[in-house]
Structures are given as structure tokens and as C-alpha cells.
């Protein structure tokens, strides 16, 4: 096990725990402490399995378990508890990197450590105001901070939408706490010890947490908002490569994305298909020569993904596929009236 210890990883895991264990071991064996949170909804057998798989590593910890449903407070609570353990148990850690169980390192750990050591007081977190954000899908940029969301968007969609419309109609609004300027950004960040400690030890944290507990998708706004209060060296970008489709769902990387991932020069990527053996074998190998030192530049592959989204949503000239338009009004151009397409009748006409 190599020793550096200035970089620690917090991992939020809920599926494919065997892959999460591989990644955690990769980081831990190279001297980076790891604190793992496993979703409370994961069965005990799965949780016990990952604990046993990593039991031989002295720099791995497991935090208390929270139910982490998308869009709810549980993800923030899990991050808070795991980050607190990281700061308490590993005083040498200078940067804390938040990742998921489906993340995969793309470059040698030593390169990431060196990159952060050269920027010891810089916080890497996408953090933009609600007026400047351009990537949210479905609206609710500012309203997520001024409305209440007691219903699950995934499990109680009709109640969720109805309650949002009701609040708009009657003008119900929540008060944003004094000093809070809402910001949004990627959930996956890398913060300094000083910044993270200032957020977690804030004397007003109880009030702040009560407010954010009812913000929609708080994992994309809690740290992104509070970092602006305590840090003066924020680089508004994530060191984790992640891409999204036209619906806002994360792209999944497969084995045939190997060269694309290498071309990005990024340190970590998400989300990786758990059966992408070639990706895991390539990037978790002990060979440090697979990647040249370079500034992370996800823009190198942006055009490829933009073309994929365009093909998915607009197709190409002469191509109309029912499978590409599963919902009404998703067509590439609307006609004056309904029409039907008959296929397979060329022998008759």
C-alpha cells in the first residue's frame, strides 16, 4: 500500500456493490482513505458482503445507513455523515472527493493527488445561480427553493405534480434563510478540509438543514449553495466526467466507450455499466502509463454526445421511427393532421 493520505474518497453506493468494492480497494491500496455509505434499502446480505470484502483495509470505513431516494434529503444526510467520519478519522486528508459506487477512476491516483496538491486551497464543485443554470430538465430552477415537496417524484408523481400546481395557484412560497443565495450544480464534488469543515460545523446548520430538507433534489444545491459562503477559491466544475441525455438521465458508459473515456483526460467517470469488464480491467490495472498527464477536458467528447442526443431526438433525413418517438409531441416536426404509415405493402402496390 502506497502512502499519501492527502486525498480521501466518500462513496455513495446502492447497487453493484462488488464493483464499488473493486474501486474502493483500488483507491485504498494507493493510500487514499475511503468512507463508504450503502443505501439503507440494500439488503443486509449485500451490505455484509461489501464490508467483508474490504475488511482487510485499515483505511476504509463504513458510515451509518440512510435511505437515499432520488430527489430527497437522504442523499445529503448520507454525504454529511460519511464526510464527518472522513474528517474525524483521517486528519491528514486535505481534499475530500465525493463519488458514487458506479464511478471509475480514469487516471492513476497519484496524478489526481498531485493535481490537488498543486491546488491545496481550491474547491472543485459546479456551483451556478438559478439564473445562470442551463442544464436542468423540466423547470423548477428557483421554485425548488421556494416550494415544498412532501411527495416522491418517482413513486407519487401525480401527487407531486398536483401539489406543485396548487402551490403555484395559491401563491404559497417558503422563505429562503437569510444569507442563502441558491446555487445549483453537479452532485459530485471535491472540497478542501477547510471548506467541508466550515459547512458541517456551521453554527446555523440545524436551521439550514431544516430548510434544505424540503428543497427538491437537495444534493444538487446544498453544498453548491453553502460553498459560496465559506470558500473564496471555487472552481465551478466537477472533476468527475458525467454526461446526460435529453431527458436529464445520466449516460451509461460501456466497454466500447474505452477510447472516449481516455480521450477526456478526466480523473473519474460516472456512470459505468457494472458488466463493463474491459473498462474495469483497463482503468483499475496497476499500469500507470496508460494516461498522459493533462488538464481534465470533458469538452473533447462533448460533440460526440451532442450528436448522439441529436440523432436520438431528431433522427436523420428520411428516417421516421416509431421507437424513437414513444411519447406524443416528441416527433421531429409536426404535421397539419394525423397520418398513418403502412409498411410492407410494396408487393401489392
Region locations from a protein language model:
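ER/Golgi luminal nucleotide-sugar-dependent glycosyltransferases, focusing on the catalytic module
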Residues: 1-349
